[in-house]
Amino acid sequence: MYIVITRTFPPDVGGMQNLMWGLSNELSKHHMIKVFAEYHDNHKNFDNDCSFSIERVGGIKIFRKYRKANLINEFIKENKIEGVIADHWKSLELIKTTKKKICLIHSKEINHPVGTNLNKRALGVLNNVDYVISNSLYTKKLAISCGVNEKKIIIINPGVNPIKKLDKQTLKKSEELLKNKYPRLITVSRYDKRKNHEKIIMTLRNLKQIYPNIVYICVGYGDEEENIKKLANELNLQNQIMFFKDISNNLKNALVAKSNIFVMPSIIHKSSVEGFGIAYTEAA
């Protein structure tokens, strides 16, 4: 049996959630697994449809970390475990086991100045696991520069689930939403400084003069949502930008299919970097 420890898992939405779901689902086809994940209000129906066991841990964040670790440590003591796979070094920080440990790295969570407390904590975990799975060569080089043992790092690019054939009704709905709009630009991602929605909106102000029917479709949610909408209003681009949130995967995929260009000019913002832009792969 393998244990999967994650802080991001469906039915919550996002790239990391999709990644951890895909990893767990595929692993369950070859091994018995148990997933320890964060509590989500709508988790019951999702969990009941899964072919593997999922244990949800809720409560106040600062206490949840310790409660989750205690549950996992007890489970390891009482069961025959082959190994532990974690989405983040923090997920392994309090786990006590001599079994095989594998930790994924993505970039942002390890990008701390050498010698700082966070850097030392990350290295304390990553240099004591069996394998560090890097999502890209960029992330591997970043990890090495931060002090991670190069010999432990293996690069495995994240995969995506094949998209099912889109139904005609959803495609028709997306076409109606975008009627008479051209060209059609789209970004599917969290509203985060790193994703650089602001740059696209600033560019849109100039493109509007050349393409009066241009539209920019934003699908996602996040901390920067209000700032992005405020900028759109300040530049009088309400008619050129469409915001979508909490929509079905079918509609999201249909909007991508009916768009002309997928745009996401990511930048480095403080310690936040794009280790592997899985959104580009999903769009392709």
Predicted regions and their residues:
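A short, histidine- and acid-enriched strand-loop-helix "catalytic/donor-clamping" loop
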Residues: 12, 63, 91-93, 102-118, ...
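Nucleotide-activated donor-binding/catalytic signature segment of Leloir-type glycosyltransferases, i.e.
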Residues: 182, 217-219, 226-247, 251, ...
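A short helix/loop element that forms part of the nucleotide-sugar donor recognition site in Leloir-type
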Residues: 165-179
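N-terminal strand-loop element at the rim of the active site
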Residues: 6-13, 19-64
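Carbohydrate-associated surface elements
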Residues: 138, 159
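Acidic donor-binding loop of glycosyltransferase active sites
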Residues: 257-272
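Conserved donor-binding/catalytic core segment of Leloir-type glycosyltransferases
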Residues: 133, 177-195, 201-204, 208, ...
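Short His-centered aromatic/hydrophobic patch
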Residues: 85-91
